[in-house]
Regions:
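Alpha-helical transmembrane segments of multi-pass membrane proteins predominantly involved
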Residues: 1-223
């Protein structure tokens, strides 16, 4: 597994990290959802390529799931939620874009150092893909931490899960049932979070999670 196949696998995994940075940089909800759709599209391409080079036809089903659910259905549904909630605005962040990007670069560097050392005896392609996957996971987690808007936190969570799928497909012999269970777990979580967003909107007239903190503080003062 060398030459062009090796290079394409790395290019796709690296592209997923790059798109994760694009999500971290974005400060508008519509654009963020479009970039997440691109994130899922790159994931689907990466999984399909892994299916080809590993000669694992069942991986193609995982790629189709990523393409249909993650790149089309979920972004479309979130677009509709945004329209119904009337939250066409910029995303409020805990820290600025600059510090967030610097933190992201630090997390990617940490991922590379840790994974390449821990997996020193593993297959070269697998260990580098795992390093990229951990980078995607940590960038998704960073996005959840640095965003106040609940919708953007949902996108961060789904991006994190994309990193887990990348790690699972990069490891040979990973059962398909694991990948399917992860995908449907995210779908269920998406439904629950969608209901939760409507409840927040009805109660607080906003989806900014800082409203919840303020409400808890007011209740604490009364008690």
């Amino acid at each position: 597994m060398h030459g062009i196949t090796f290079d394409i696998a790395h290019m796709l995994a690296g592209s997923l990290v790059l798109v994760s940075f694009m999500q971290l940089y974005q400060d508008r909800l519509y654009a963020l959802l479009n970039i997440y759709a691109l994130h899922a599209l790159v994931l689907a391409a990466s999984v399909a390529w892994q299916a080809f080079i590993q000669d694992a036809p069942h991986r193609y089903l995982t790629a189709v799931i990523a393409l249909v659910f993650k790149a089309i259905i979920i972004p479309t549904a979130l677009h509709r939620i945004i329209v119904r909630l009337g939250i066409h605005r910029e995303i409020e962040t805990v820290v600025g874009v600059g510090p967030a990007m610097l933190l992201g670069m630090g997390l990617v560097a940490l991922s590379m150092v840790v994974m390449l050392r821990v997996t020193a005896d593993a297959d070269p392609l697998a260990r580098e893909d795992l390093a990229f996957a951990l980078s995607v996971v940590l960038l998704g987690l960073l996005m959840m931490v640095t965003r106040r808007n609940a919708v953007s936190q949902v996108v961060g969570f789904m991006s994190l899960e994309n990193g887990l799928v990348l790690a699972a497909t990069g490891a040979k012999g990973m059962p398909l049932v694991v990948e399917i269970s992860v995908a449907f777990s995210v779908l269920i979580a998406f439904i629950v979070i969608g209901i939760f967003l409507f409840r927040i909107r009805e109660r607080f007239d906003t989806v900014d999670v800082s409203a919840l903190d303020q409400f808890r503080g007011e209740r604490g003062d009364r008690m």
